Amino acid sequence: MRNCNLGEHPKIRDYGSEPFVFNIRHATNMNRNFRTTLWTGQDMQLTLMCIPACGDIGVEIHPDVDQFIRVESGKAKVYMGSCRNHLQEQAWVDENFAILIPAGTWHNIVNVGVCPLKLYSLYAPPQHPYGTLHCTKEDAEREEH
């Protein structure tokens, strides 16, 4: 089992699919990348995200992937719905809120605060290739298209 304190200067990389123990709050708050894959297993994946002020993750859908998101710091508005152009479910979230997104649900998360929004996301099954690291949203969009 790998035990990583991800201290002051963490070595952020994909530690999957070995057992792994770490301080998730610290790792999430230390992450400065738009998306960092920290652990990829056979049936689940953990990513850390940092959304800049006034930024968003972008409207997206995962047809075959359930998603759990927890906000560690910041303020956001969550949008979800069955149609890309009609995200009728909306909620304000901040630190310690959890968001559950069923497979096949369109969604977006918008940072409405003045500080970066720090969150982590669990995908089941994995959504991104092993070791995915996107420094910016633009990097993520380039890779996905």
Where is each model-derived feature located?
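A short, N-terminal "cap"/entry segment at the start of jelly-roll beta-barrel domains
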Residues: 1-45, 58, 91, 135-145
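A short beta-loop-beta micro-motif enriched in histidine and acidic residues
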Residues: 34, 38-44, 54-71, 86-87
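Conserved hydrophobic/aromatic beta-strand scaffold that supports enzyme active sites
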Residues: 37, 46-50, 68, 90, ...
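A generic "binding-loop/recognition-motif" signal
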Residues: 44, 53, 64, 75, ...
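Short, conserved beta-strand element in jelly-roll/cupin
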Residues: 50-52, 63-78, 82, 122
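Short beta-strand His + acidic residue motifs that chelate non-heme Fe in jelly-roll/DSBH
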Residues: 57-59, 78-79, 101, 107-113
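A short hydrophobic beta-strand segment most commonly corresponding to one strand
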Residues: 68, 115-131
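Short acidic-glycine-tyrosine-enriched beta hairpin
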Residues: 83-103
